Amino acid sequence: MDKFRVQGRTRLSGEVTISGAKNAALPILFAALLAEDPVELQNVPKLKDIDTTIKLLSQLGVKIERDAASGSVFVDASGVDEFCAPYDLVKTMRASIWALGPLVARFGKGQVSLPGGCAIGARPVDLHITGLEQLSAEIKLEEGYVKASVNGRLKAAHIVMDKVSVGATVTIMSAATLAEGTTVIENAAREPEIVDTANFLNTLGAKITGAGTDRITIEGVARLGGGVYRVLPDRIETGTFLVAAAISGGKVVCRQTRPDTLDAVLAKLREAGADIEVGDDWISLDMHGKRPKAVTLRTAPHPGFPTDMQAQFSLLNLVAEGTGVITETIFENRFMHVPELIRMGAHAEIESNTVICYGVEQLSGAQVMATDLRASASLVLAGCIADGVTIVDRIYHIDRGYEGIEDKLRALGAKIERVKGE
């Protein structure tokens, strides 16, 4: 397995170009199963999860090609002839459940192995299943597979979601585009990636309104065609590089990003003492050589503070002036990076879904292990500012969600190299 070797005590400064959002590109790729004509997706990041999705869609009979130079992916789902997403691909990535809604909506049948992915607590697929059942799909759980079928077209429904779920909102919204009648989703997720998926589907001819609010309306259509669509920039990658500069007293400019998707994160960075400026598609952060101040925050569904930035802000608090408290309300078991940071000299206490961070002036390099995608990013950033050398193991997690992170960090002055596994 590959590792990162990071030499620390670096002030990270410079410019970084932000990639397309993984959390938008994945649902959009699966939603392309609904299109009867070819689709071109631009600004698709080069990531392990994207590669897995392309492989999975190919197995279903989708003709799919990536232009490495431009970052575009060309999808032709006119010849889909297989309706089962098998365990060997699904086990590494729980986003595969997003194949189910489009398959049953367009072809009347689909089955997906129960998913895998990051080991951060229980992320059940129940909300996906109940949503599809309300759209009149018949669901069976057999031999580790979720099997969905319907006679004729799905039927529209008024769906009130038990809890806010990005994944289930995507599933229901995608499937409802081809249902008979008008579907309303109440208590829908409001994330920018939901809006991006809805905008993509509308480009193909869907009739979706209200995405970005808690009430989405989908007027079903008979078919979806093709089109060209550009995936929005990755707000979590943007936030990660802003934190990299903030914890090292540095200065960074993030290009080709969307400041309007990061209000909660920018507010907390300003509270930590960062000098921040924004334009239409750029954000600059300057710490003027100072240590950040500790902040207190709670993760929450959008437009609240994103859970995917929690690990990076845990690190910020652990090297900040003062004491900060972080409460994780979205996922259980999402503080697995904290014991690793304690190995590097951090001082923290975990109580249930809260971590109390007592800032220290300096971390020390150590051998640490990545446990999930965002935790691994925080460990790499910790290595950049720690005294000595840090080895980050199991970095396959980071390759799932950050495109060329070592190259981008090197451009900011980091001393980081990938050590190939045996």
UniProtKB/Swiss-Prot annotation:
InterPro entries reported in the protein's UniProt record: Enolpyruvate_Tfrase_dom, Enolpyruvate_Tfrase_sf, MurA_subfamily, RNA3'P_cycl/enolpyr_Trfase_a/b, UDP_GlcNAc_COvinyl_MurA
Active site, per annotation: 118
Predominant location category: cytoplasm
Residues given in the record as phosphoenolpyruvate binding sites: 22-23
Signal peptide feature range: none
Keywords associated with the record: Cell cycle, Cell division, Cell shape, Cell wall biogenesis/degradation, Cytoplasm, Peptidoglycan synthesis, Pyruvate, Transferase
Residues holding UDP-N-acetyl-alpha-D-glucosamine: 94, 123-127, 163-166, 308, 330
One Pfam family linked to the record: EPSP_synthase
Cell location: Cytoplasm
Modified residues (2-(S-cysteinyl)pyruvic acid O-phosphothioketal): 118
GO molecular function, one term: UDP-N-acetylglucosamine 1-carboxyvinyltransferase activity
CDD domains cross-referenced by the UniProt entry: UdpNAET (cd01555)
Catalysed reaction, written as an equation: phosphoenolpyruvate + UDP-N-acetyl-alpha-D-glucosamine = UDP-N-acetyl-3-O-(1-carboxyvinyl)-alpha-D-glucosamine + phosphate
Pathway field: Cell wall biogenesis; peptidoglycan biosynthesis
GO CC terms in record: cytoplasm
Domain of life: Bacteria
Function description: Cell wall formation. Adds enolpyruvyl to UDP-N-acetylglucosamine.
PANTHER family assigned: UDP-N-ACETYLGLUCOSAMINE 1-CARBOXYVINYLTRANSFERASE (PTHR43783:SF1)
The protein, known as: UDP-N-acetylglucosamine 1-carboxyvinyltransferase
Gene that this sequence comes from: murA
